[in-house]
């Protein structure tokens, strides 16, 4: 896929606001490739009440939403701007969120709800003992009309196995409702389409959101482990690195073990598109120098659908004299 700059749309409630109420404003960042984009509010000056949802990949392009909750008095007295940066396309967009003019027909007095659908976690999809779930989230539900009904479809056939949680009250006095659909691993890997349909008395019409696995032939990664650089051995903490390259789609899970025990002190870079259209990432495990020098075995473990049995791992340990 080619590098594509995002389109940025402001999201504002279409209702008259009470002076003492909280208001949630949003920014829709649509149709970009590759990851990542960064979203800040008022160039970082607004940081509390910010929620940026994970990006969703559909038809080869990513879409992401970020929201910020502020007192309505703040919104009416000062500008609220979302700042979007997409390094891959050298794009920077500042979008001011302005109150929508209320026409007499359009103002019902109810909040404007938004619906988001999220893919299952990669680890859940590729581990037979875990249960992958597609998740549908509705935000900004008015307490005046809190009933929300979820319907789920797999390839347009309705299913009734979803687990819908009780609505949760948010800091801006609206409600948030979540429905999770447990799915069969193979259905996701085979590219079936999962659709969430949300209905409410407050909606003029049902809202539908769909998601499926990115199209294209899976390619398994090559995995390489690298010992701490010699120059780093003067420090008390050293880095063990795992390079994972040549994989598609970008959905992958990488973790570390020491002597077979899971470790937590590691960080992964996001999957990044390489020049050939495949993806690569680096994973860095931090350990004490003595832990490395004692000859413990460190293993980089990778889950990806293009691998045999969806799994591979590479180990290394310190050898005296190296």
UniProtKB/Swiss-Prot annotation:
One GO molecular-function entry: immunoglobulin receptor binding
Keywords assigned: Disulfide bond, Glycoprotein, Immunoglobulin domain, Repeat
Domain Ig-like: from-to ranges: 6-98, 115-212, 221-317
Glycosylation sites per record: 172
Coiled coil stretches, renumbered: none
One Gene Ontology CC term in the entry: immunoglobulin complex, circulating
Signal sequence, start to end: none
GO process terms (BP): antibacterial humoral response; complement activation, classical pathway
Gene3D superfamilies tied to this protein: Immunoglobulins
InterPro entries: Ig-like_dom, Ig-like_dom_sf, Ig-like_fold, Ig_C1-set, Immune_Resp_Modulators
PANTHER family: TAPASIN
Protein name per its UniProtKB record: Ig gamma-2A chain C region
Organism field: Rattus norvegicus
Lineage per the UniProt record: Eukaryota, Metazoa, Chordata, Craniata, Vertebrata
